[in-house]
Amino acid sequence: MGLLECCARCLIGAPFASLVATGLCFFGVALFCGCGHEALTGTEQLIETYFSKNYQDYEFLIDVIHGFQYFIYGTAAFFFLYGALLLAEGFYTTGAVRQIFGDYRTTICGKGLSATVTGGPKGRGARGPQRAHSWQRVCHCLGKWLGHPDKFVGITYVLTIIWLLVFACSAVPVYIYFNTWTTCQSIGNPTKTSASIGTLCADARMYGILPWNAFPGKVCGSNLLSICKTSEFQMTFHLFIAAFVGAAATLVSLVTFIIATTYNFAVLRLMGRGTKF
């Protein structure tokens, strides 16, 4: 078999949907977690500097921000592991589907994964059998999961519903910063609005960011315009937009995972007549 023919058969058997979804998932999660973390830090600095001088006014806000940042850490770790499992599931089920259709039976990765799941070669040496036995138990557990794509369909479906809420929440700070930026544009171009510049304000209390007794709690007129021109505000605004885009990319990847996994499961169940693999 020539090199080109071998590469062509590998490409034919590759689960392209799972590969694209995994890459999109890792990209989206990295963008959401990295930019979201820095955007929350920038928001904390803006509140402390311009909207309130009393620590008690934004003490609860800081706790909430830190809680979201810890959530981001957990999200990054979880999606890294789950994305790798979904990619392995894609190789595993795609090999079985190719076998049913009589195509190239499995990919090189699928063969390696199958060998790993079945235990692989035995260990050597005094501690070899013990290590091999422990590794076989882990692989056996992994094989049970990879052999049941319906579990991945259910988990990914629930995860997609949860991520829809995360996606909606990531749009809230973008909306707040966009309103503030629009107000600054009106202040910078007085001819575009009939209101006086002094009445154009950004009130953090209105969005529930600060309590109503916070002072000053809002910034108006030329002071607000000067804030919008700072690098901190512009950077934080763009970071929230990037985090929103990352959340959208992650949502698309999860939907792609659902479609690919559901298709493989349906083919294996209907055309494979329920054969376990």
Swiss-Prot record:
InterPro entries tied to this protein: Myelin_PLP, Myelin_PLP_CS
Keyword Metal-binding on entry: no
GO (cellular component) term, any one: myelin sheath
Intrachain S-S bonds: C184-C228, C201-C220
Primary location group: membrane
Lipidation (O-palmitoyl threonine): T199
Signal peptide boundaries: none
Residues with a covalently attached lipid (S-palmitoyl cysteine): C6, C7, C10, C109, C139, C141
Keyword vocabulary terms for this entry: Cell membrane, Disulfide bond, Lipoprotein, Membrane, Palmitate, Transmembrane, Transmembrane helix
Extracellular compartment segments: 37-59, 179-238
Residues in the Cytoplasmic compartment per record: 2-10, 89-151, 269-277
A Pfam family annotated for this UniProt entry: Myelin_PLP
GO molecular function, one term: structural constituent of myelin sheath
Compartmental location: Cell membrane
Family the UniProt entry places it in: Belongs to the myelin proteolipid protein family.
Protein function: This is the major myelin protein from the central nervous system. It plays an important role in the formation or maintenance of the multilamellar structure of myelin.
Protein name: Myelin proteolipid protein
Species the sequence originates in: Taeniopygia guttata (Zebra finch)
Name of the gene this protein is made from: PLP1
